[in-house]
Structure formats: structure tokens, C-alpha cells
Design a protein with these regions (language model features):
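Pyridoxal 5′-phosphate
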Residues: 1-238
Length: 238
């Protein structure tokens, strides 16, 4: 199998072209490009609002995409929300669940290795609600300080919002253990899987996270596509 042949960009670049910036954004796979072309060429219509054939086809393909994403992370289709990016997915959690459920003296825990897209929304929520934003420190080797995490995990901690894999160092956080300890404390957990989703198999039922976000552009799909997974009981409530 020639992997380069699956990415059309290599056909227009010189033969020595090598791409090393996939941590920032991935090249687009031929299947993603061809599917977008198929939609725009064959059934470019609004979804969920019409009964004429191409609209029904567009709706079917849209919901089929949702089913495939759900299957990919082992969730229910009803637990998948499409957004424009992982960043928008985090914002949606922060400004819906966060503003509705957090109050003065509640605590949000994030780590010092977070991407700014998982910092700024919680800073805003803390300012609006009076809750407290605390940071889990990072050790000299770049790994999460798990002893400090456990000491910070008080009864006031209502949410942990944590990156799965660092976009800077590639460090993979032990999210299963963190989620287990959080749930024992009555704390919800949001996982930013934007960096890890292309490299690590993620089963949301197994890891038992409450929310999970990722984006298409870091897994060979188009820009402007993101995913928010949320446990159904939380989505229904918020």
C-alpha cells in the first residue's frame, strides 16, 4: 500500500515533498476530498427539512456520518454533536454546561499543559460565575504531577477539563485513572482528544469520560468540522 498516493497533495508537489506538521493540521485524504466533491456535485441540499430526493440523500449521509463517528468512539449516535472545531466543542460545554451548573467557590481543574482553547473558555466561566480555576502542575519531564492532582481533588471540584495528548510534547496523560478518581469524587471529566484521536483508540464507554472533543482537520478530514461527545443524560439536561 502506497500511503502517499492516498493524499492528492503529493501529486502536485515535487517528489521530495515531506510533510512534518501533522500535529498542527493533517493533509487531506482522498476519501474526504471525494466525499465533499460528491456532496457538492450530487446532493447539495439542506438536511432535516425537505422530502425531495437530494435533500433526503443529504440528510441520510449526514446522519450516516454521525453513526460512523459514534461507532468510532463506541458511543450512541444521540451523543454526538457536530461543531466547527474542537475549540467550539469546548466552548459549547463551557458556555452551556459550565454557565448553567457552576457557581461561586466551585472549582474547575485543568492542567498547565493545556492548549489555550482549553484555558480561555474556563477563565471566562470562572469570571462570570465566581467559580475557581485551578491548574494541575507539570513535572520537569513534561508529565502531569499526579500527586498534586490528587491533592487538588477536593469536594468543590465539579469539572476536570484535560488534554489527552499534549500538542507540544506528545505526552499522553493517564486519563482512565484520572477519570476513575474524579468520578469517585463526584466530578465530571471533559477530555480534549484533538491530538490523540488519530493515534490512540478511544472507547468512551471504557474510559467513562463525560465529555470528549476532537476535530476533523487533525485526522485527515476537512477544516471546519468538529465533534462533541457528551453522555446523553448530560446533553438532555443541558
Amino acid at each position: 500500500m502506497n500511503i502517499r498516493n492516498q493524499f492528492p497533495i503529493y501529486k502536485v508537489q515535487n517528489k521530495n515533498f515531506i510533510y512534518l506538521d501533522s500535529a498542527s493540521t493533517t493533509l487531506k485524504h482522498e476519501s474526504s476530498i471525494s466525499k465533499l466533491k460528491e456532496y457538492n456535485s450530487e446532493y447539495s441540499a439542506n438536511i432535516h427539512r425537505s422530502v425531495y430526493p437530494i435533500a433526503e440523500k443529504a440528510t441520510y449521509e449526514f446522519e450516516e456520518s454521525r453513526r460512523k463517528v459514534a461507532n468510532f468512539i463506541n458511543s450512541k449516535s444521540e451523543e454526538i454533536i457536530f461543531t466547527k472545531s474542537a475549540t467550539e466543542s469546548i466552548n459549547l460545554i463551557a458556555y452551556s454546561w459550565g454557565l448553567s451548573n457552576l457557581k461561586k467557590d466551585d472549582v474547575i481543574l485543568i492542567s498547565k499543559m493545556e492548549h489555550h482553547s482549553n484555558m480561555v473558555p474556563w477563565q471566562f466561566v470562572a469570571k462570570k460565575t465566581g467559580c475557581i480555576l485551578k491548574y494541575i502542575p507539570v513535572l520537569d519531564d513534561g508529565t502531569l504531577d499526579l500527586e498534586s492532582f490528587e491533592s487538588l481533588l477536593s469536594s468543590n471540584v465539579k469539572l476536570i477539563s484535560l488534554i489527552h495528548q499534549s500538542n507540544v510534547l506528545g505526552i499522553v496523560n493517564p486519563i482512565e485513572g484520572i477519570i476513575k478518581k474524579a468520578h469517585q469524587n463526584g466530578t465530571l471529566v471533559m477530555i480534549d482528544a484533538a491530538q490523540s484521536i488519530s493515534h490512540i483508540e478511544i472507547d468512551v464507554k471504557k474510559i467513562d469520560c463525560d465529555f470528549l472533543v476532537f476535530s476533523g482537520h487533525k485526522m485527515f478530514a476537512s477544516t471546519g468540522v468538529g465533534v462533541l461527545f457528551g453522555k446523553y443524560k448530560l446533553l438532555e439536561k443541558n
